[in-house]
């Protein structure tokens, strides 16, 4: 599943080609995505795309007549191609612009989404309850420490709660906790402020590095230009259960926390 870095990489890839252009049409070849694509998405036709921003894992395509909300789901990826480009299997949505370019969503598993918001998009039901962005000043040591107090859930599950902080998905939670030396099973409320002082900057550094390297390609994700994300080459624990720790050579342990695969080193992480 594309996580925050992959969605941000997609945003950076598409923005130069479509911002400031007029949307000619929104063509939906298959409405059967995570939620049925509403007819209201056509309200943006004939309007200039003012900006492409990101909130959590949602891309927000803002016009002066509402906003398209785009989610990549489990397997979605975006390309900007000439309008006449032949469609591939699973090309479900085309957003065509006045410069002859098309933003095309390919989504084999159809867990992606295209929705429309006419009013302030920050109040949309999908966005209104989200926690702070991890790469902003709002996500800081004091904030995370205070939110963790009284929490008995594992610190990894806590970090992946998008009401606490958005975008720290399974890959990056595994990696950040390893770098911080924190056992992912430890209760979030039992971790000291000193340890959160180490963890918060590591989360920020891990996500920023992943964005710089084009995200993580494990199976489906590619950048807008078709290239893979290269952060996969930097993974130290994710996907390495049963292999040797790169730091101490202890065998990495794999468990499930909150229905998600979790890999950690029993020696390096306490």
Curated annotation (Swiss-Prot):
Involved in base excision repair of DNA damaged by oxidation or by mutagenic agents. Acts as a DNA glycosylase that recognizes and removes damaged bases. Has a preference for oxidized purines, such as 7,8-dihydro-8-oxoguanine (8-oxoG). Has AP (apurinic/apyrimidinic) lyase activity and introduces nicks in the DNA strand. Cleaves the DNA backbone by beta-delta elimination to generate a single-strand break at the site of the removed base with both 3'- and 5'-phosphates. The keyword ATP-binding does not apply. Binds 1 zinc ion per subunit. One of its GO terms (biological process) is base-excision repair. The active site is at residues 2-3, 57, 260. Keywords: DNA damage, DNA repair, DNA-binding, Glycosidase, Hydrolase, Lyase, Metal-binding, Multifunctional enzyme, Zinc, Zinc-finger. SUPFAM superfamilies: Glucocorticoid receptor-like (DNA-binding domain), N-terminal domain of MutM-like DNA repair proteins, S13-like H2TH domain. Its EC number is 3.2.2.23, 4.2.99.18. This is Formamidopyrimidine-DNA glycosylase.
